[in-house]
Amino acid sequence: MAGVVSVDGLRKRYRSRDPWAVDGVTFALEPGQAFGLLGPNGAGKSTVVKIIAGLLRPDEGKVELFGSDPGDPAARKDLGFAPEDPDFPKFLRAAEVLDYFASLLGLDEQERKRRIPETLEFAGLDKERRQVRQFSKGMKQRLGIAQAILGRPKLLILDEPTADLDPLGRRDVRALIERLKESGVAVLLNSHLLSEVERVCDTVAIMARGRVIKEGKVVDIVPEGRTLEDVFVELIQATTPPREQLPSFISDQRPS
């Protein structure tokens, strides 16, 4: 089966005199794999995602989406995206929200009647009759994912899917991601909640200053008795110039 995403030697900067926003990034994403793209603010994660989605062109290197250029509409139709804070009309119900997006996808009435209940059931919203304005944050996140998979994508990009969720909401979203993986959907996850990434991602790439400084399977890069957060913090501190690190009297007071 063909790979989902292939990124090879990717470089991008926004102006000729600027430093590289992305500098030599290489990784691949396969069907049914959950891949975590991690890094502090300004590391270049969003730029990489925009290039994969065909919203930006790289300056150097090669990016393929399902074996094609990311700008190819045929490739992009197999891509779904769920933002951190999905926004839907507050007085619609979940089924009505999906019906609206199904019409934008060009699905005929018969296909909509089949696909919408199927998608709502997958997202655990099939029995929900309340309007969106009455939804919890977690329910809105699940509706956002439902909208993103309505077109049956082979790649789903999730931006901070568990941010600001309570433990039950995070559990529901994790379960949904696991079901997507089991169905063969590849998931590209951008999140600062490293404990969540560690639980759902097979592979991660940690970025700093536009470069991937560590990439591999979670089980391989996180030593026994340590956490992904431990590894992340050590790597980022090792690549951050001393002048940009917190003064010792501040860092010493940070919670352990």
Residue ranges with predicted function:
Residues 1-13, 241-256:
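ABC-family P-loop ATPase nucleotide-binding domain
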Residues 3-5, 12-189, 194-208, 213-214:
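ABC transporter nucleotide-binding domains
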Residues 19, 181, 225-229, 241:
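Short glycine/proline-enriched turn or capping motifs at secondary-structure junctions
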Residues 105, 204, 225, 236-240:
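Conserved NTP-handling cores and scaffolds of large molecular machines
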Residues 119-122, 224, 235:
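Short acidic/histidine-centered micro-motifs embedded in hydrophobic/aromatic stretches
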Residues 142, 152, 235-242, 253:
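Short, leucine/isoleucine-rich alpha-helical interaction segments at C-terminal helix-coil junctions
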Residues 211-233:
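Conserved beta-strand-loop-alpha-helix hinge in the C-terminal portion
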Residues 227-234, 238-239, 245-247:
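N-terminal low-complexity Pro/Gly-rich stretches
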